[in-house]
């Protein structure tokens, strides 16, 4: 037998003699690793971000600190909130599909997701003053696109029927 095999067999014999549970040395090293991980995780957020993170938890939002840090960094870089939301939605799409397949209720679980998106885009008198400029500009852009389509249809209608109300000249 080689020296490595002898040490391995001695370690196995000592662990069997100690009992079926893990040795105290293993527990100490695992708890030390966990403590290092927790300390590292706590250092992820600066004090201001940590306060925001605590507020999100108080609001009932469960999110990993590292994911929260990424979101905060994106928003600090002036990435549009809608773009961040769409990115998160696309990243989570795989998880939702797996969840719905396991639950066998794909139509029920997908329906609230679509209604949430539509509900957020509706103008709300209480939140209309707090909306960011990105959301307003997207609404303005869509309102600019809407008149182009009816103008083409008006011209087709007026040329086909030969009747014109004359109101479109102003």
Swiss-Prot record:
Residues 8-20, 151-170 have a biased composition (Low complexity). Its main location: cytoplasm. Keywords: Cytoplasm, Cytoskeleton. Residues 123-132 have a biased composition (Polar residues). It is found in: Cytoplasm, Cytoskeleton, Microtubule organizing center, Centrosome; Cytoplasm, Cytoskeleton, Spindle. Residues 1-26, 102-170 are annotated as: Disordered. InterPro entries: MOZART2. GO terms for cellular component: centrosome; cytoplasm; gamma-tubulin ring complex; spindle. It comes from the Eukaryota. Belongs to the MOZART2 family. Part of the gamma-tubulin complex. Interacts with TUBG1. This is Mitotic-spindle organizing protein 2B. The gene is mzt2b.
């Amino acid at each position: 037998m080689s020296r490595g095999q002898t040490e391995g067999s001695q370690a196995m014999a000592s662990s069997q003699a100690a009992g079926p549970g893990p040795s105290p040395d293993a527990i100490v090293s695992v708890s030390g690793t966990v403590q290092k991980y927790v300390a590292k995780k706590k250092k992820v957020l600066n004090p201001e971000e940590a306060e925001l993170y605590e507020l999100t938890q108080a609001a009932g939002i469960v999110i990993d600190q590292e994911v929260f840090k990424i979101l905060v960094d994106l928003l600090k870089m002036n990435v549009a909130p809608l773009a961040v939301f769409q990115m998160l939605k696309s990243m989570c799409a795989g998880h939702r599909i797996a969840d719905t397949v396991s639950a066998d209720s794909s139509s029920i679980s997908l329906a609230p997701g679509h209604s949430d998106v539509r509900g957020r885009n509706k103008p709300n008198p209480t939140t209309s003053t707090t909306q960011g400029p990105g959301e307003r500009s997207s609404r303005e852009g869509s309102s600019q696109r809407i008149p182009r389509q009816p103008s083409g249809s008006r011209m087709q209608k007026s040329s086909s029927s030969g009747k014109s109300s004359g109101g479109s000249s102003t």
